[in-house]
A protein has these predicted regions:
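Acidic, metal/ion-coordinating pockets
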Residues: 1-266
């Protein structure tokens, strides 16, 4: 029975995260016989946000699709890149007038995969459209045009990610993989939902374990102690790639196996 192996990579944090991806992603693809890599890159640029340089480096290192989140708008010079490259997604529940696209159907080894990027509203940006409504509309519009979907739910609240995943899976919308991003903390709840979607609440990050969500400890501690603005500095040491590996069976396009990735250089 033929299957597809898909790797989903947690938020790539700054230059250290991108450099780690550049050194290791192609080897990981070969080692695990990966057919497709989707990575969240919304914090991959130097400083914050995402830019053409970091996105291009992630693609050159072996990623097929880059998802983002609420930081996608931090660099105006990136807007034209979004408009010209549909393999980089911004959240689909931003207004249609925004640059870029929130989903794309991509051919991977002869199979049509719908990649969709959704933004949570709890503790995030309540003015955006409900991701539940957005998901319904897109899945309905593209019904019959894809074999299965991979969804990035970029959200703060675990309850919102959990509920949206079960909503999508429960309606049998042909979702093969649903994962959460944003918190930079990998959860240990990877499992297969009732109708066959592989799910994890958060992939984690590609960033330093000896940090606060990828930022130098002393910087964040200072902010908590003083309540004053600080300049975020990305920690460069002890980088780990976190995410999941999923196996999708091509006879029914359901997830047959999901496991966490925690890769560090020796």
């Amino acid at each position: 029975m033929k299957s597809l192996n898909i790797m989903c990579v947690g938020d790539i944090v700054g230059v250290p995260g991108v450099e780690f991806i550049k050194r290791n992603l192609w080897n990981l693809r070969k080692e695990h016989n990966i057919d497709c890599v989707v990575a969240n890159g919304e914090n991959s640029a130097k400083g914050n946000g995402i830019d053409a340089k970091s996105a291009s480096a992630i693609f050159d290192s072996g990623a097929d699709v880059i998802t983002t989140g609420n930081h996608v708008w931090h660099r105006k010079e990136f807007y034209s890149f979004l408009d010209g490259n549909r393999f980089v997604l911004r959240p689909a529940n931003y207004p249609d007038a925004c640059p870029g696209a929130g989903y794309n159907i991509i051919d991977i080894t002869g199979y049509k995969i719908l990649f969709i990027n959704l933004l949570g509203t709890v503790y995030m940006e309540p003015g955006t459209e409900s991701p539940f409504v957005t998901a319904d509309r897109i899945f309905s519009r593209e019904k019959g045009n894809f074999d299965f979907a991979v969804a990035d739910i970029h959200a703060e609240a675990t309850s919102e990610k959990n509920a949206l995943a079960k909503y999508i899976d429960g309606k049998e919308l042909k979702a093969g993989i649903i994962f959460g991003t944003h918190t930079h903390v990998q959860t240990s709840d990877e499992h297969i939902l009732k109708n066959g979607a592989g799910y994890i609440t958060d992939l984690g990050m590609t960033g330093s374990l000896d940090s606060v969500l990828g930022i130098k400890n002393e910087v964040i501690i200072q902010k908590f102690l003083t309540k004053m603005p600080v300049k975020f500095e990305v920690e460069e040491n002890d980088i780990e790639l976190q995410g999941i590996l999923c196996r999708i069976e091509t006879d029914n396009f359901k997830c047959a196996e999901i496991k966490r990735i925690n890769f560090r250089e020796i």
